Amino acid sequence: MSAVTAVKPEDVYQINDLNLWYGEHHALKNINLTIPEYEITAIIGPSGCGKSTFIKTLNLMINMVPNVKMTGEISYNGTNVLNSKVDLVELRKKVGMVFQKGNPFPQSIFDNVAYGPRIHGLKNKKELNERVEKALVDVALWDEVKDRLHSQALGLSGGQQQRLCIARALATNPDVLLMDEPTSALDPVSTLKIEELMLKLKEKYTIAIVTHNMQQASRISDQTAFFLMGELIECNDTVKMFSSPDDHRTKDYITGRFG
């Protein structure tokens, strides 16, 4: 009987020879990387290595920074998003972003989650209610807030606010979720809830997460990319990366010799 061949996941992103400058500063240098569908890709590296810059290129949030120039290719589902004809609103609808600290709008819990669908034209009240409920269920927040949906979101705890922001990103029905250090401002219990949530969400979404926490990267990710001084040093299966990395600089970083 022949051996069963593992099915390789499709690559949602293919990044080829990506370079980025802030003015004269060369921040990303010849980045080549793929991000597989329905997996968690962890992006690690010391402060200033380019990891947050990189993740913001994936839905072109980086374009909000003045004097940014990019060359190369960022292919999302076969389309180079660096093409000037790309619809940025549609791209950011399909590639959501969650930042380091929960940043709910000064509105109700309901209005925070409904914000994205509304700006994308969803007006039917029943559909909007269903979309909000589904997003809150997906982030395991529904049972905690269903009786106070019209209360101020800023009254939630830090961990709840971060889950609310994830729900807000999910409400537009994205394919990809980008997370820039989403647990760095949270306590250990809230961090664990977010990690458990990410492992559940990868059944439906492709996730890329920037993290300074090596234990977190090893716990939740399928592949890990190590950045250093604007270069991608190594991208590998997470188990291999943390047990026998190919590059000595990767080993030095994950074992705490610098960073």
UniProtKB/Swiss-Prot annotation:
It catalyses: phosphate(out) + ATP + H2O = ADP + 2 phosphate(in) + H(+). One of its GO terms (cellular component) is plasma membrane. It holds the Pfam family ABC_tran. Residues 7-254 form the ABC transporter domain. ATP binds at G45, P46, S47, G48, C49, G50, K51, S52. It is found in: Cell membrane. It is a peripheral membrane protein. The complex is composed of two ATP-binding proteins (PstB), two transmembrane proteins (PstC and PstA) and a solute-binding protein (PstS). This is Phosphate import ATP-binding protein PstB 1. It comes from Bacillus licheniformis (strain ATCC 14580 / DSM 13 / JCM 2505 / CCUG 7422 / NBRC 12200 / NCIMB 9375 / NCTC 10341 / NRRL NRS-1264 / Gibson 46).
